[in-house]
């Protein structure tokens, strides 16, 4: 085995950073999604920085302490005041064998019933209470998705179908999508996204990541920018505004449903071209150059083939959005083979109470 997992069975001497769990149901033997709920919020972020630093040092031979400004895992607005709770605008549940809504036990298929979900935003919690999600009896195995976006009314899907007022909503115009709004300075970007499609779950994440990406790309007025793994177009619209009338944005996404959302969200943006297909295949078919490349790959990272295709376009800089420190470090090492060095990095605590973090890295040559 490359690694071992262990569970604490007894605490002989508690760390000063150990606190009463903010979510006892996510403790030992409990549900997943809150594995750090017994750790003080500041200590969670310091530990995540240590993990990020260790992966970059081990896989990319980069010392995080050499970067300026100094890298810390940043909390998002409102999180400290809420104690790292009530941030999720999307919550997925499943009914257990007795018909109660709950979540899977950590690294298990067993469903444990819940009475509440403390990471859920206030709007999600209100929706759950209004629809009696945790007190209603469901058919065992029922999938329950609660979505309360920043920008429109909440939506409840039951086994993928709209649910309203205690029953399935069979109206032809029943809502299956939501509207998200991201405010950047004096400009507001509006996105229509499938209710069960991908969108950042933290209420402040879309704005925080987009600001970091725009800071990372710098002045791109008149430039050609590639937006790879572009999803529903979170970065595409702000990048289109940044390149201006003389620039272009090529957005590439492999997921068909995300591309449908992206086409709606990019409607009217004349300088945006959308391509549907695996990123490596689209890049192989399109040999045009790029001034700047933005990548936001899934957890597995971009990988060597995509990195080589990106480097072959000789952009002046690459802005890499990562949700896995090891994948980021590996791809930073691949980019280094083509002369790109890590010049700045920001890390965000988008998932308090869990081991996950998000990073935005800028590489230049």
Predicted regions and their residues:
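Accessory RNA-recognition modules of RNA-modification enzymes
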Residues: 1-295, 300-308, 314
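A polyampholytic, Gly/Pro-enriched intrinsically disordered region
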Residues: 191, 342-343, 365
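Core SAM-dependent methyltransferase catalytic element
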Residues: 356-365
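S-adenosylmethionine
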Residues: 275-357
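Residue-level signal for inorganic ion chemistry
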Residues: 34, 324, 361
């Amino acid at each position: 085995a490359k690694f071992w997992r262990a569970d604490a069975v007894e605490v002989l001497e508690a760390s000063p950073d150990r606190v009463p769990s903010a979510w006892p149901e996510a403790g030992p033997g409990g549900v997943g999604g809150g594995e750090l709920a017994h750790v003080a919020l500041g200590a969670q972020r310091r530990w995540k920085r240590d993990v990020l630093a260790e992966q970059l040092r081990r896989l990319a031979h980069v010392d995080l302490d050499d970067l300026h400004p100094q890298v810390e895992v940043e909390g998002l607005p409102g999180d400290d005041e809420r104690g790292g709770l009530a941030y999720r605008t999307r919550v997925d549940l499943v009914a257990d064998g007795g018909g109660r809504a709950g979540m899977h036990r950590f690294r298990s298929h067993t469903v444990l019933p819940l009475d509440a979900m403390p990471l859920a935003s206030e709007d999600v919690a209100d929706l759950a209470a209004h629809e009696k999600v945790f007190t209603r009896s469901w058919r065992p195995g029922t999938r329950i998705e609660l979505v309360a976006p920043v920008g429109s009314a909440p939506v409840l899907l039951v086994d993928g179908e709209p649910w309203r007022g205690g029953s399935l909503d069979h109206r032809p115009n029943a809502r299956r999508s939501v509207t998200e709004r991201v405010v950047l300075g004096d400009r507001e970007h509006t996105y229509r996204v499938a209710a069960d499609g991908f969108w950042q779950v933290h209420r402040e994440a879309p704005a925080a990541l987009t600001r970091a990406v725009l800071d990372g790309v710098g002045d791109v007025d008149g430039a050609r920018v590639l937006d790879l793994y572009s999803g529903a177009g979170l970065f595409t619209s702000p990048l289109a505004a940044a390149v201006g009338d003389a620039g272009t944005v090529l957005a590439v996404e492999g997921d068909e449903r995300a591309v449908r959302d992206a086409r709606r969200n990019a409607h009217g943006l004349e300088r945006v071209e959308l391509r549907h297909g695996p990123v490596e295949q689209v890049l192989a078919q399109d040999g045009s150059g790029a001034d700047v490349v933005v990548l936001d790959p899934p957890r597995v990272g971009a990988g060597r083939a995509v990195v080589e295709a990106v480097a072959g376009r000789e952009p002046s800089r690459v802005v890499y959005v990562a949700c896995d420190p090891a994948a980021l470090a590996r791809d930073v090492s691949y980019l280094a083979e083509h002369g790109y060095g890590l010049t700045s990095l920001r890390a965000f605590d988008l998932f308090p109470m869990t081991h996950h973090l998000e990073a935005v890295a800028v590489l230049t040559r």
